[in-house]
UniProtKB/Swiss-Prot annotation:
Residues 2-76 form the Carrier domain. The gene is acpP. Belongs to the acyl carrier protein (ACP) family. 4'-phosphopantetheine is transferred from CoA to a specific serine of apo-ACP by AcpS. This modification is essential for activity because fatty acids are bound in thioester linkage to the sulfhydryl of the prosthetic group. It is found in: Cytoplasm. This is Acyl carrier protein. Pfam families: PP-binding (PF00550). The lineage of its organism: Bacteria, Bacillati, Bacillota, Clostridia, Eubacteriales. GO terms for biological process: lipid A biosynthetic process. Keywords: Cytoplasm, Fatty acid biosynthesis, Fatty acid metabolism, Lipid biosynthesis, Lipid metabolism, Phosphopantetheine, Phosphoprotein. The keyword Cytoplasm applies. GO terms for cellular component: cytosol; membrane.
Amino acid sequence: MSSIFDKVKAIVVEQLGVDEEEVTMETSFEDLNADSLDIVELVMALEEEFDIEIPDEDAEKIKTIGSAVEYIKENQ
């Protein structure tokens, strides 16, 4: 799980320009001041990195770093 978390964290840090220390399993994208465009770009980056497809209705449910990691783990 930590390798998925590390990859997700790296993508979030790169896409949102936040410090690594700000990104934990409990951090919400709202906490990182991500707007709807940021979320779309993050979902696209996660889909590319993990070679999965995240339907819009699932993407709307992914609110935290931890929920993104869990989703990827379940759908890889």
